[in-house]
Design a protein with these regions (language model features):
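Hydrophobic packing and interface segments
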Residues: 1-172
Length: 172
């Protein structure tokens, strides 16, 4: 009998494990390619990966029922629908701050890492930004797989319910 928290922890573990494997693979592949600045380019990938994780955690914080922003939004519904609308718009605007700041810092850091902290090396700096985007999207596969789990499980439960099976089937 798994609890929701156990399932979410398992999904988070899978994402974290894939992130670690991506970091190891990045450093190994770029080292094997024997590039002059393989370490700095690898750091740009890691910066992108960190930015992706920060965006994901920020999204979870502002949208999960387990955290204060959504709890506070639901409490605002006690005073009427207008309060919910105003609070929701404000919360939506506030929730974009962390991802935007993370992307800006990530762009600057990945540029500097790939360029070797040399502002005149524009080509390599721009490559660093591009490779950081690859790092940011590198966990997309497992993230989409974990996001797809919820609707699939819900549909399976609905099918079990419509077919007249017992409540124990729905709980499984």
């Amino acid at each position: 009998d798994a609890k929701m928290k156990d399932l979410l922890n398992s999904l988070a573990f899978g994402t974290n494990l894939s992130s670690v494997l991506i970091v190891v693979a990045t450093f190994l592949v770029l080292w094997l390619l024997k590039l002059d600045n393989w370490m700095w380019i690898s750091c740009s990938v890691v910066v992108g990966l960190i930015v992706g994780i920060v965006i994901g955690r920020s999204t979870e914080y502002y949208t999960s029922q387990s955290y204060r922003p959504t709890q506070k939004l639901s409490e605002s519904g006690k005073t009427g629908p207008a309060t919910v609308i105003i609070s929701g718009i404000g919360l939506g605007m506030l929730s974009t701050a962390i991802p935007v700041i993370a992307v800006v810092v990530g762009i600057i850091a990945s540029y500097l890492f790939a360029a070797g902290f040399d502002f005149s090396n524009v080509g390599l700096g721009l490559y660093g930004i591009g490779i950081a985007a690859v790092g940011m999207l590198s966990t997309l596969g497992i993230t989409l797989a974990t996001d797809a789990y919820g609707p699939i499980a819900d549909n399976a439960g609905g099918n079990a319910e419509m077919s007249g099976l017992g409540e124990e089937v729905r709980k499984r």
